[in-house]
Structure formats: C-alpha cells, structure tokens
Amino acid sequence: MGASFSALFIDQDGVSSSSPCLGDLPESCVASIIQHLDPPEICKLAKLNRAFSAASWADFVWESKLPPNYHILVHKILGFVPRNLGKRDIYTRLCRPNTFDGGTKKVWLHKSTGGVCMSISSKGLQITGVDDRRYWNHIPTNESRFHSIAYLRQIWWFEVNGEVEFPFPVGTYSVFFRLQLGRASRGFG
C-alpha cells in the first residue's frame, strides 16, 4: 500500500512532483487519532489544515468527551434537546457557564477534563440571617459570577445549608466555599 501511495507523487520521468503531506491523510484516520486528545488540543490541531479541521467536527470525537448522561444535562440546562446540533456544538455550549434554577446556580463542563462543575450563589443557599439587613448586605459586584455577593456585617454563628438536585454523572466531587475575610473596604458595608 505504501509503494502504490508513493507512486501517486512520481511523474513519468521518475521525478517526484510533490510529496505527501498531513492534508493527504484520510479524514476518518485523523479523527480516530485526535479523539484520544484533550479538547483544547483538538481545537489547536483543527487549525492545521482542512483535513484536521473536518476531522475535528466528527461526532464520535466529541461524544467521547461528553459525560455519559449529557442528554439529561442538556435538557436540564437548555430546557430542550437540540436535534440539529453536532456533538462539538453541544460540548461548546456545555463548557460555557449555564444559569439555571432561577439564576442561583451555574453549571459547566471543565474544558480539558469534561468534568461537571457547579457554582451556587449565596441566594441559592440557606445562610443564617442572610435576609436580615442587620447582619448581611447584598452588594452588586463584577467579581462574582452572579454579579452580587452577600457581605456579612456581624453575626454570632454561621450556618450554611443547601440541597442540589442535579443529574451529576457518577464520580467523585469536591465542595468548596469561597469566602473573603478581611477588613471592610469603602465599597463593602
């Protein structure tokens, strides 16, 4: 097979007219290879040439990057399952922070790992005295994903409760609280 492929690039005098290049690889072959790469690497390779660009749109490449229950996630986040979107488009939409549950939660896929990430605003949790202005202020800010933070003025105890009903894929997850401790500044309080 290699000899007959090489013969395509030799003219009648036995002189090589042009040599084979990466663009000559079959699209299915390229797609089979790039499916083993991380999504950012796939997107970088898509800029190489037309063959890599076309292969980067193959549904089977992106289906392997999506969580197993991505149909449920798409329905939960978008409210419908788009029938005319390719898997790459679905992956791209899920990688953006998608707001749901009355704007109190955002969910997205980690671009490199495909893991599901979620952020919950202070308004999406039950926090001790959060609605009492003697203890808390809600301050608009661009530093928060939700464009608002709960600023604690004073309190004697602090409890946070919350429940999440979400179709997370099977796996191990971590929970983090973002708190900023320090003195009150002019803008806060």
Q: What are these regions, as identified by a protein language model?
A:
Residues 1-35:
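CRL adaptor-proximal regions
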